[in-house]
């Protein structure tokens, strides 16, 4: 997503190749910082489209493929929230995949343990059903 587009801006003006490269690099960094994932186990496919189509494409992909990180393990795309928001609960992503330095400073633990989150992921992958909260 182009900068500003999630807040109602058009995100126009930035080179789309630079924006995409930066975002994919951020994602690679998030994976690389974990203590229990290896970046070489991941592959990436992407399609460059006009900014107007990004939200529609993203929504269709999420609805079609129902990826676990959108349904159960939220927090992969998060950035450092800064000191003012460190009292918030640690994301499921950072609970299951610890290691991002800024996330280690988050004060409140997730209400679920890494083991509980992992069990829900296995259940979802085996059954296609999102566990009840």
Segments predicted by a language model, with ranges:
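Boundary/linker segments flanking structured domains
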Residues: 2-133
């Amino acid at each position: 997503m182009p900068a500003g587009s999630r807040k109602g801006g058009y995100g126009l003006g930035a080179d789309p190749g630079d924006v995409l490269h930066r975002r994919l690099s951020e994602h690679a960094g998030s994976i690389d910082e974990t203590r229990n994932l290896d970046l070489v186990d991941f592959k990436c496919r992407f399609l460059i489209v006009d900014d107007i189509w990004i939200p529609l494409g993203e929504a269709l992909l999420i609805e079609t493929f129902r990826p676990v990180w959108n349904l159960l393990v939220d927090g992969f795309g998060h950035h450092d929230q800064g000191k003012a928001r460190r009292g918030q609960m640690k994301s499921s992503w950072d609970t299951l995949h610890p290691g991002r330095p800024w996330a280690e400073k988050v004060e409140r633990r997730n209400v679920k343990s890494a083991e509980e989150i992992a069990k829900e992921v296995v259940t979802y992958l085996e059954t296609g059903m999102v566990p009840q909260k």
